[in-house]
Regions:
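N-terminal alpha/beta PP-like core and its mobile active-site loop of ThDP/TPP-dependent enzymes
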Residues: 1-325, 436-438, 548-552
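Short, glycine-/Ser/Thr-/acidic-enriched flexible segments
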Residues: 76, 102, 163-165, 211-213, ...
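A short acidic, amphipathic alpha-helical/loop segment
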Residues: 34, 82-83, 216-223, 349, ...
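Phosphate/pyrophosphate-binding active-site segments
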Residues: 135, 159, 274-368, 464, ...
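Generic enzyme active-site microenvironment
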Residues: 233, 272, 361, 413-414
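Thiamine diphosphate
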Residues: 97, 105-114, 227, 370-554
């Protein structure tokens, strides 16, 4: 007879969940002890719950199978919520296991007692369950795995009371078989094909998200584009996008709503493929939240719970585009930069050094604005982005990606302020010997908030307001921080030194951190002028507006 913890682990392993990212406490000790009896399960320790949840997200994005977490009570879940929020927005499959007090102990309202289910529903709206008995635990776990897998993928939270975990009487359960997701109806496919055929080149755009940004689906979208002149756009922050030489180029919508509106202007029909209709990230005084241009109709080819690949394939057939050759990105690579570093030069150096089949975890914020353009033609790679906007994702997601794909180099482009949210991820990289190169942009400010302060029209910033966006006093030393967490690190100030550091880090196994001290991307007069330039875009002729957009966010 198995304990509940043993039955839970066996259900996870048999259900294809082979990695759990943990930050356990007393309530989870029986699960921890049971790990030795499940050698197929890899347990990866994190020093902070936000690292564990972000790593499970990165793992799920790259493995394509659920990652699991082990968290301690409601407070532990609370510490991990930000990156579970990102996972929810990215539709990542995660089995989120949260330990709880023994069922008979909750009545005493001990110090760590809390309403875990209420906290969990913020990030697991589709599946939250407290397992009420050891006999039922295996089945609860199997249903959590099925829920996490989707489609679409989701965070499924399973709450594990301590006595349910330690008691005898558990048995493993089989994950229910998933029905194949439906593809778009024939009526939908034919209607959209008719709209595409009836328009002029550029009138119609496919807005791709989720699974539509993988190689197979991109090739199909590329055929549609070649055959009909349809534009290919991607959501602002994709969970995972495959890009680079030999793949169809896709234009990501800009973060700033004014720039995204320029990209969308002129489109008559916007077709969603595993994506949502575009909206601004925040509300701004006097500005619309809905970014769909006037006169544009929004259609859905495939929703997140539908067969994206099959739906695109059906559209290709309906257009007679099966033999159309998609436009592919030509191979190109920038030259390594020289001289004093800027954020643009750091992006250039990374692109110049990018190895084949790399994975990029991008949380560079304003410092990484030029990375997409300078890396467009480098060898094919994956980019993982900040799906839910909750910063502190970049380093943990890099951990998970490296665990999922140990044979692929991982590069984390990380802003200084964001890094400090989950810096403990460096320790896990060192402990696990993960092949992650962290390129740290230290501009000593919350650069994006300086821009937002101007855009929101909040008025002239005084010394107190400015101090809230300044990270220069005291100066953070990321080399010493990394060394203290077991990661080799160096600071560079020139393009030549950065190129040398990248070559060394990418050639030597294990984690490395390279700190680049760079000026903020948008400062001074450029920062003052930016809101006026952004507001003027809607009134400018489209070619002029697009040229300005290309300068601000290439």
């Amino acid at each position: 007879m198995s304990t509940g913890a043993q039955a839970l682990l066996r259900t996870l392993v048999d259900g294809g969940v082979r990695t759990v990212f943990t930050n356990p406490g007393t309530s989870e000790m029986h699960f921890v002890q049971a790990l030795d009896g499940a050698p197929e399960m890899r347990a990866v320790l994190a020093l902070f719950e936000g690292v564990a949840t972000g790593a499970a997200d990165g793992y799920a994005r790259m493995a394509g199978t659920p990652g699991a977490t082990l968290l301690h009570l409601g407070s532990g879940l609370g510490n991990g919520v930000a990156n579970l929020h990102n996972a929810r927005k990215g539709k990542s499959p995660i089995v989120n296991i949260v330990g709880d007090h023994a069922t008979y102990h909750t009545q005493y309202d001990a110090q760590l007692q809390s309403d875990i289910e209420t906290v969990a529903r913020n990030v697991s709206p589709g599946f939250v369950r407290t397992s009420a008995s050891t006999a039922q635990l295996g089945q609860d776990a199997a249903e959590a795995i099925a829920a996490a897998q989707g489609p679409p993928g989701q965070v499924a939270t399973l709450i594990l009371p301590a006595d349910v975990s330690w008691s005898e009487g558990g048995s493993a359960a089989k994950v229910p078989e998933r029905a194949a997701p439906p593809r778009a109806s024939e009526e939908t496919v034919q209607r959209l094909a008719g709209l595409i055929r009836g328009g002029k080149p550029g009138d119609t755009a496919l807005l791709l998200g989720g699974r539509a940004l993988r190689r197979d689906t991109l090739m199909l979208a590329g055929r549609v584009s070649t055959a009909a002149g349809t534009r290919l756009l991607a959501e602002v922050f994709p969970a995972r996008i495959e890009r680079g030489a030999g793949l169809p180029p896709v234009e990501r919508l800009a973060y700033l709503a004014e720039l995204a509106s320029v990209q969308l202007r002129g489109i008559k029909h916007l077709i969603l493929v595993d994506s949502k209709s575009p909206v601004s990230f925040f509300a701004y005084p006097g500005k619309a939240s809905d970014l769909v241009p006037d006169g544009c109709e929004v259609h859905t080819l495939a929703a997140p719970d539908e067969d994206v690949l099959g739906s695109l394939d059906a559209l290709v057939e309906a257009l007679g585009a099966a033999n159309a050759q998609p436009l592919l990105q030509e191979a190109s690579r920038p030259k390594p930069p020289t001289g004093p570093l800027t954020a643009e030069k750091v992006c250039q150096a990374v692109a110049a050094a990018m190895p084949e089949n790399a994975i990029v975890s991008d949380e560079a914020q304003t410092s990484g604005l030029t990375f997409a353009s300078v890396s467009a033609g480098v060898p094919a790679h994956d980019v993982l982005t900040l799906t839910g906007g909750a910063i502190g994702q970049g380093l943990p997601v890099a951990v998970g990606a490296a665990v999922a794909c140990p044979d692929r180099p991982v590069i984390a482009l990380e802003a200084d302020g964001s890094a400090m949210y989950t810096l403990q991820a460096l320790w896990t990289m060192a402990r696990e010997g993960l092949d992650v190169t962290v390129v740290l942009f230290n501009n000593r400010s919350y650069g994006i908030l300086n821009i937002e302060l101007q855009r929101t029209g909040a008025g002239e910033a005084g010394p107190v307001a400015k101090s809230q966006l300044d990270l220069s006093t005291p100066q953070m030393d990321f080399v010493q921080l990394a060394l203290g967490l077991g990661v080799p690190a160096r600071r560079v100030a020139t393009g030549e030194d950065l190129t040398d550091a990248l070559e060394h880090a990418l050639a030597e196994p294990g984690p490395h951190l390279i700190e680049t001290v760079v000026p903020s991307t948008v400062t001074g007069a450029r920062l003052k002028v930016m809101p006026y330039a952004l507001n003027a875009l809607a009134k400018l002729p489209l070619p002029v507006a697009r040229a300005i957009k290309g300068k601000l966010a290439p």
